[in-house]
């Protein structure tokens, strides 16, 4: 499933292999916003990892390892940095001009974490994770309109889950047909348009004659 702020595309595949990602995203020159699934690393484009996923994982680690001081230090610094960034987004939107002021702090956070002498397992694992993804955590600071999370994708996944629970099992052909219909329905929803009216109109393209 692939989405941006106005369009959703569900692609039926037997697995989440990286070859499928590269086929779908061949020639893509934008910024890919994703979770930390390793197959995305093979896509040759700028990338932004979902910071909500990272924060959730950090909170889960804190719950499991409440006495890991290194982990708490990383969590504190990351939380403070993210709060400042979100405040800017809330006030000025996803604009590189406004977000650029946080680049120094973001670089400082990554460098500080990299220099830490982590001892316990949880803190050390998080340190390595941040080091591995250091070039993909704050990419959005350099671009207009690139979100720092993949909430749109999460919403689109829930829409597919509801459909799957309703229809139950199906053939691969059926899954492809459902994926096409759901892509149309969700794209129309993102654009504030009626699925029923669009289907009745006989139009073959969503933008055709819509003025949107």
Model-inferred region functions:
Residues 1-212:
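Catalytic center-proximal scaffold of phosphoryl-transfer enzymes
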């Amino acid at each position: 499933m692939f989405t941006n702020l106005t369009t959703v595309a569900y692609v039926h595949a037997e697995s989440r292999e990286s070859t499928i990602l590269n086929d779908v995203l061949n020639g893509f020159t934008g910024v890919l916003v994703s979770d930390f699934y390793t197959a995305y690393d093979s896509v040759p484009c700028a990338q932004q990892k979902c910071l909500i996923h990272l924060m959730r994982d950090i909170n889960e680690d804190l719950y499991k390892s409440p006495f890991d001081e290194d982990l708490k230090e990383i969590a504190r610094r990351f939380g403070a940095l993210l709060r400042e960034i979100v405040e800017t987004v809330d006030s000025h939107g996803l604009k590189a001009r406004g977000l650029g002021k946080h680049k120094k702090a973001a670089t400082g956070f990554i460098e500080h974490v990299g220099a830490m002498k982590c001892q316990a397992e949880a803190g050390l694992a998080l340190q390595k994770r941040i080091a591995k993804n250091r070039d993909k955590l704050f990419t959005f600071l350099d671009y207009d309109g690139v979100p720092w999370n993949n909430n749109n994708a999460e919403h689109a996944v829930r829409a597919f889950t509801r459909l799957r629970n309703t229809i139950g099992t199906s053939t691969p052909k059926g899954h492809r047909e459902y994926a096409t219909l759901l892509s149309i329905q969700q794209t129309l929803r993102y654009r504030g348009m009626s699925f029923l009216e669009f289907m009745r109109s006989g139009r073959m393209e969503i933008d055709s004659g819509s003025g949107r």
